[in-house]
Amino acid sequence: MSVVLPFKHPSTILIAGPTGSGKTEFLVRLLQTRSVQPFPQRIVWVYGEWQNAYDRILQLRLPSVKIQFVKDFNEEIYDSLDRNTRNMVVLDDQMENENAHSKGGSSIAKFFTQGSHHRNLTVVYIVQNLFHQSKAMRTISLNSQYVVLYKNPRDKQQIECLGRQMFPNNPRFLTASFEDATKKPYGYLVIDLRPETPESYRIRTDVFDSNGQTVYVPK
């Protein structure tokens, strides 16, 4: 089934996959196709190490959009967000940053629990492991409205665990959908957990395909 469903602003997005799986490319396409609606007016990209893909982002033609790159997370980022502006904050490669997960101040978890609503914010967190063992990561995953999963040959249990949580009566459905979506190189599965999304449109892939997104529904 093919449909067209944009990512809605404000929202919380979690993207998980190993190095080189295509996570950053997903964000490039998300911006390039303006697949967030309404589209952000300010984008703050927090990174650990500079990547060539960032040069492509700076070259994107995004009229009236301010793009800022910041090396490493700091608490001032949250306070700089004007609620009268449509903000997007991308947190890339910040899992090992102690400041990003501090108990005090504006940790990443705060972006997911308060920022989206109070700061007119779409926050995107890019990680390698969906089930990283930390209290903050659990809070982030529970408050993610969109989850984008890439294939991780070394950790097949994360999708099985998620399948049991979301579809306890049919856990194999999510696993089968994920296997189909990721059988091609750089394939991914989008899990849409926004409350207004119809149940039949929650699991999908190929979200930037001009012919429409592919949707998976339980049999």
Q: Where do the PLM segments sit?
A:
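Conserved GTP-binding G-domain of TRAFAC-class P-loop NTPases and closely related GTPase folds
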Residues: 136-219
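A structural signal for isolated positions on well-ordered beta-strands in alpha/beta enzyme cores
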Residues: 44, 122-124, 189
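Extreme N-terminal starter segment of soluble prokaryotic enzymes
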Residues: 9-11, 41
